[in-house]
């Protein structure tokens, strides 16, 4: 790392004189316009009738020093929540917009889709410190304008790379904080060389011990870019690599071991009644009995000879690490993943009316989970075995590796025509995906099983290939009727073909394989229309937009007893008003999102922590989003936003497991129940202080109750929480060598709140001890918490 930073400094110094001379011959505004052309196809046009939040380069660059992943910055905008498995905001991280999870949020980088084509998620852990590479971000809530890649059912996030710098420069940064979290990185630009060339690069890495047990790890990213430009033309190649080896905790802080639940009223105290009172209702209760950092992927609750959970003298439950057969400790469950993006883009400012851009892209990804499986049934891996006496072996400890290899490649093109009252953008995106899913058993504690299946070192228990083709074409136009009025129209056609075959990682109880033979094609037409009126700082807008979305892989492979998945449709209606004055601004946005066959989270997880979903025939989300800010003094500003919503399923049939039998379910009908993971209120408040070189921000965030399934049962929910963070920066501007020196401190969760921001639930009807009514059944919750009070200090030097 020291060698890399030294090389940055040498390259920067050597290029200074020549680059400064050449930079003078270019108009920087024209260079910025060429970058704007690259993202014009996926961003809302000026005055477009959508709910939009823009994040500036300075905010992105400052946030990148925290080591946290980008969703935690996005969570400062209306209607967004974020959380991470390790409790610190680094590594494996997730987000929701308007209650819609990652797979329903379209994300692009310079117009190139970033969502993994099969599961439609973005793996933020593989985007460490990306904020330092970006020039801006635009978040569109709701359907928004047409974009490339998967359909937007919660929102669209358009990331734009920073404009190549005409002048040479460099930056190094170091951060250190709680739980031994260390973030470091640097970047450089040669400035303009030979009147046409710019070379730039960056490297960032975050190491941490993690708040949750067994979540230590490291993740990082690197970037290398070459730009060739003329006054109105630019070709740019970007190579962005990502790597991670991070400890996993997708089960969260689970209230129990396996089928034995610690939740109040669901614990078996030895009487076989499963109704003992433990006093555990939420994550705070788990923390108070010594289980606040408990991770079932790393350890298990200790039990006595009677099979009951053991406490110490202080009333805290004891845990014990997983062990291998030789007595050594299992290190931890890890996600090991490498990804490399290659983007070659060209943008051309043709004349006063026409601009165009095209990008070729290729992404390679490869990785696997390495996981200890305690006391698992053999049939889950397609195994059968007997001991020397011919007795069937039913369970053993295992280590498995579940992995995938991905190749994604395609082309993105768009052209923009502006003349008189017209602003027209047309374009297309064509993308192809090839992937392979695989799973190996690499260890078992049972000698008989090992001799039968692992004599060659490992045993492949599933293997599946996948192919996905995605092509979309769009045309969007804005017409200015008068100085105050504009109308908008947007049409998109999208074709998707998905095929997967091979055998899945699901086996019947007699160890028979689950063969996959899925071949689906979808054709979607997504029209949108709206208007905008603006005068003297006032703006009123409205729109109606349709979007469709195909099922993701898990909808086919982990569907349980629910019907075969269907594509979903959304009609999104937005109406808003904003006002901007010299010292204050305010805005309100109303929305109604009407879903047909919406994929709704069931509250269950796949066995690698993915949220499982199923189609719901009729559902809706409606709400109001408020934003306001005022600067009463030159050194003080106050801002806030609020997202208040109602998220309902009109009618819903729940499939409830009976007596833990895989093929026995009861169906329970609900009317007008609240959608899972959809809080009715998300509030953010900010107080910003800036005086000379000092900047300080107080940020308080409130999230209301979240139900973990779709039954609107308070027992199976996460209570509301409020958390406050404070950050302070001080900037020095030396006159020589170092352009800026920035010292920063981040204080997170300053009131040390104990809360979970996400989770999962399993519930069942157990007839052995009497039929539980729907509001009092057996249940177990996994809480995904954030850490209590933490802090991080950072230093940034800019040259």
Which role does the model predict for each range below?
Residues 483, 592-594, 614-710, 794-798:
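Gram-negative outer-membrane beta-barrel transporters
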């Amino acid at each position: 790392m020291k060698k890399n930073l030294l090389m940055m400094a040498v390259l920067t110094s050597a290029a200074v004189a020549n680059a400064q001379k050449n930079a003078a011959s270019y108009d920087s505004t024209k260079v910025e316009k060429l970058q704007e052309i690259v993202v014009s196809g996926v961003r809302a046009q000026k005055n477009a009738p959508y709910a939009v939040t823009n994040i500036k380069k300075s905010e992105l660059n400052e946030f990148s020093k925290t080591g946290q992943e980008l969703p935690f910055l996005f969570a400062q905008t209306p209607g967004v929540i974020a959380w991470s498995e390790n409790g610190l905001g680094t590594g494996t991280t997730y987000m929701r917009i308007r209650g819609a999870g990652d797979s329903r949020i379209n994300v692009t980088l310079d117009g190139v889709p970033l969502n993994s084509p099969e599961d439609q998620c973005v793996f933020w852990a593989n985007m460490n410190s990306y904020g330092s590479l970006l020039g801006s971000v635009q978040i569109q809530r709701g359907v928004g304008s047409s974009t490339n890649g998967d359909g937007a059912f919660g929102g669209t996030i358009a990331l734009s790379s920073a404009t190549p710098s005409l002048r040479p420069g460099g930056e190094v940064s170091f951060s250190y904080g709680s739980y031994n979290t260390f973030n470091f990185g640097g970047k450089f630009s040669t400035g303009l060389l030979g009147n046409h060339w710019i070379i730039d690069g960056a490297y960032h890495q975050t190491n941490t011990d993690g708040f949750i047990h067994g979540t230590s790890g490291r993740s990082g990213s690197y970037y290398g870019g070459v730009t060739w430009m003329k006054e109105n033309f630019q070709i740019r190649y970007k190579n962005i690599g990502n790597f991670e080896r991070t400890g996993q905790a997708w089960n969260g802080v689970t209230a129990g071991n396996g089928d034995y639940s610690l939740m109040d009223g669901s614990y078996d105290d030895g009487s076989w009644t499963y109704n003992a009172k433990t006093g555990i209702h939420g994550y705070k209760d788990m923390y108070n009995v010594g289980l606040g950092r408990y991770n079932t992927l790393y350890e298990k609750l200790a039990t006595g000879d009677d099979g009951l959970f053991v406490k110490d003298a202080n009333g805290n439950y004891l845990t014990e690490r997983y062990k291998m057969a030789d007595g050594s400790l299992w290190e931890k469950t890890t996600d090991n993943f490498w990804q490399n993006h290659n983007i070659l883009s060209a943008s051309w400012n043709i004349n006063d009316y026409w601009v165009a851009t095209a990008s070729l892209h290729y992404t390679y990804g490869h990785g696997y989970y390495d996981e200890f499986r305690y006391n698992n049934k053999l049939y889950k891996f397609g195994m059968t075995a007997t001991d020397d006496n011919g007795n069937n072996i039913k369970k053993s400890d295992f280590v498995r590796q579940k992995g995938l290899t991905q190749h994604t490649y395609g082309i993105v093109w768009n052209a923009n025509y502006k003349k008189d009252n017209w602003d027209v953008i047309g374009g297309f995106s064509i993308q192809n995906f090839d992937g392979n899913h695989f799973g190996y058993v690499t260890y078992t504690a049972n000698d008989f099983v090992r001799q039968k299946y692992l004599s060659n070192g490992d045993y492949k228990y599933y293997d599946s290939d996948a192919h996905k083709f995605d092509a979309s074409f769009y045309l969007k136009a804005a017409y200015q009727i008068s100085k105050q009025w504009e109308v908008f129209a947007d049409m998109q056609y999208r074709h998707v073909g998905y095929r997967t075959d091979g055998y899945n990682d699901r086996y019947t109880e007699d160890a028979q394989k689950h063969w996959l033979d899925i071949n689906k094609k979808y054709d979607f037409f997504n029209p949108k229309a709206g208007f905008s009126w603006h005068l003297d700082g006032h703006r009123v807008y409205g729109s109606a937009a349709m979007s469709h979305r195909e099922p993701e892989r898990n909808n086919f492979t982990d569907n349980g007893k629910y019907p075969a998945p269907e594509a979903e449709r959304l009609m999104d209606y937005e109406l808003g008003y904003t006002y901007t004055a010299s010292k204050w601004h305010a805005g309100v946005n109303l929305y109604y999102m009407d879903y047909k066959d919406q994929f709704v989270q069931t509250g269950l997880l796949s066995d690698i922590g993915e949220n499982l979903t199923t189609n719901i025939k009729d559902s809706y989300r409606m709400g109001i989003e408020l934003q306001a800010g005022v600067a009463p003094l030159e050194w003080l500003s106050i801002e806030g936003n609020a997202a208040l919503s109602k998220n309902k399923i009109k009618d819903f049939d729940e499939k409830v497991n009976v007596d833990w039998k895989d093929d026995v379910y009861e169906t329970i009908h609900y009317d007008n129940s609240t959608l899972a993971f959809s809080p009715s209120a998300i509030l953010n408040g900010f107080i910003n202080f800036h005086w000379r070189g000092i900047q300080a921000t107080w940020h308080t965030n409130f999230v209301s109750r979240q139900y973990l399934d779709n039954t609107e049962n308070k027992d199976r929910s996460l209570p509301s929480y409020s958390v406050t963070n404070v950050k302070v920066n001080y900037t020095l501007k030396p006159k020589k060598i170092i352009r800026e020196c920035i010292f920063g401190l981040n204080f997170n969760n300053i009131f040390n709140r104990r809360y979970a921001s996400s989770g999962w639930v399993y519930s069942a009807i157990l007839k052995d001890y009497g039929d539980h009514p729907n509001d009092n059944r057996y249940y177990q919750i996994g809480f995904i918490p954030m850490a209590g009070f933490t802090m991080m200090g950072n230093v940034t030097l800019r040259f």
